[in-house]
């Protein structure tokens, strides 16, 4: 009898341990399919080197590489853009950008280069805008002028998230250019209850991902174009606060969004689909009460590809395509604010099969993750004297 039990135990493969993390806030919530949460822990085999490229940035939020290898960086609290050289030298703050509202979670957010930047010099940025009755997310474009007096010229606001709301939280604000030249804009639901419920309201931009043309007009093939009572810029809806988004090798959009207490999500937003917030989710209110009816599934609402409980507080996403670290090919790298980690996900057939937490020993809140032209990852740390970190192989 004992021999039979021992043989059975030997024959049964043990479940691999997940990444070390705290207990779930809502242990009664169960995943909808295997590996939807707490996937097997994996470990990068390539020895890594972490280099501080630049320091002294005022709460940096977004980063984009210029063709010459310099970096365009936003400073959230300073409401400014800077150009940072590979040696860490910082330009003066660019002039010409509109004023921002820096209260709460507001300020200067993401930056992106136009697909035709090499000829047009056009850049895009998102920011919190003061308005009558509250605030909202805005997206502007202009021509970048470098040199001794760096500035932005011909500035034009091309998009404003509507409606205006008396809130200083959950702006979203990531900018991602699609392969066809259209621009994805992520928009938070503003956190407070009057905004949260609008994530399911197609007359509102709150809690949505928008898809617009570079001039701010709406693409004719957006999913809700021509439908009465619906904002035509909407691509997908039912989102909470998306501060991480990127395209994969096939040009598909992925996003990682913040949950409440538990329930951060990885999603692949498709045209016209509903991602559930606040009707379904895998977290609870900060008070410990359930969100709505406490549902994790509902008809017509998409399941997250992956979720975290406890949260990582995701901000910034890069999907690795470089050659510097071959074992990372196709892996997802997510900035973790609350988790103070660079979170690595290994996917197979659009399902997560492994997770790793990198840089945890540093204790940095990571705000953005960008793959550089050299195949290294460049990170922004979220503090009043923020850094640009380079994560690359120890041996070039």
Where are the language model's segments positioned?
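Gram-negative bacterial Sec-dependent N-terminal signal peptides
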Residues: 3-15
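Acidic, Gly/Ser/Thr-rich repeat motifs that build Ca2+-stabilized beta-propeller blades
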Residues: 17-193, 244-247, 252-255, 259, ...
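Surface-exposed loop and turn segments in beta-propeller and other repeat-based domains
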Residues: 92-106, 154-171, 214-235, 278-309, ...
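Beta-propeller blade signature
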Residues: 137-147, 201-215, 269-270
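Internal metal/ion-chelating core segments
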Residues: 175, 182-195, 199-236
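Repeat-solenoid scaffold signature
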Residues: 230-270
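Conserved blade-ending motifs and adjacent loop-strand segments that build the rim/top face
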Residues: 239, 352-373
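Short acidic/glycine-rich loop or secondary-structure boundary segments that cap or lie
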Residues: 254, 261-267, 274-278, 284-290, ...
């Amino acid at each position: 009898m004992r021999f039979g039990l021992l043989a059975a135990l030997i024959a049964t493969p043990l479940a691999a341990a997940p990444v070390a993390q705290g207990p779930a806030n809502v242990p009664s919530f169960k995943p909808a399919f295997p590996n939807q949460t707490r996937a097997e822990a994996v470990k990068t085999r390539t020895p890594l080197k972490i280099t501080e490229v630049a320091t002294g940035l005022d709460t940096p939020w977004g980063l984009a590489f210029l063709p010459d290898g310099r970096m365009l960086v936003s400073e959230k609290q300073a409401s400014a853009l800077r150009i940072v050289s590979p040696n860490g030298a910082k330009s003066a703050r660019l002039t010409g950008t509109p004023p921002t509202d820096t209260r709460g979670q507001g300020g200067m957010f993401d930056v992106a280069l136009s697909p035709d930047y090499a000829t047009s010099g056009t850049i895009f940025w998102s920011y919190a805008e003061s308005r009558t009755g509250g605030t909202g997310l805005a997206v502007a474009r202009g021509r970048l002028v470098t040199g001794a007096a760096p500035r932005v010229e011909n500035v034009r606001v091309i998009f404003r998230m509507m409606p205006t709301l008396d809130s200083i939280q959950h702006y979203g604000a990531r900018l991602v250019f699609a392969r066809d030249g259209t621009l994805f804009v992520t928009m938070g639901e503003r956190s407070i209850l009057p905004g949260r419920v609008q994530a399911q309201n197609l007359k509102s931009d709150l809690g949505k991902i928008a898809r617009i043309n570079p001039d701010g007009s709406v693409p004719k093939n957006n999913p809700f174009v021509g439908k009465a009572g619906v904002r035509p810029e909407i691509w997908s809806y039912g989102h909470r606060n998306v501060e991480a988004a990127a395209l994969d090798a096939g040009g598909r959009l992925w996003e990682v969004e913040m949950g409440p207490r538990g329930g951060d999500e990885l999603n692949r937003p498709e045209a016209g689909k509903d991602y559930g917030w606040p009707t379904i989710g895998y977290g609870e209110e900060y008070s410990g009460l359930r969100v709505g009816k406490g549902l994790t599934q509902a008809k017509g609402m998409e399941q997250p590809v992956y979720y975290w409980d406890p949260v990582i507080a995701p901000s910034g996403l890069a999907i690795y395509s470089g050659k510097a670290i071959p074992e990372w090919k196709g892996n997802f790298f997510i900035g973790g604010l609350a988790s103070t980690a660079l979170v690595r996900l290994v996917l197979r057939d659009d399902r997560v099969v492994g997770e790793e937490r990198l840089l945890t020993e540093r204790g940095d809140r990571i705000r953005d993750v960008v793959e550089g032209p050299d195949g290294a990852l460049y990170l922004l740390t979220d503090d009043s004297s923020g850094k640009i970190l380079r994560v690359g192989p120890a041996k070039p």
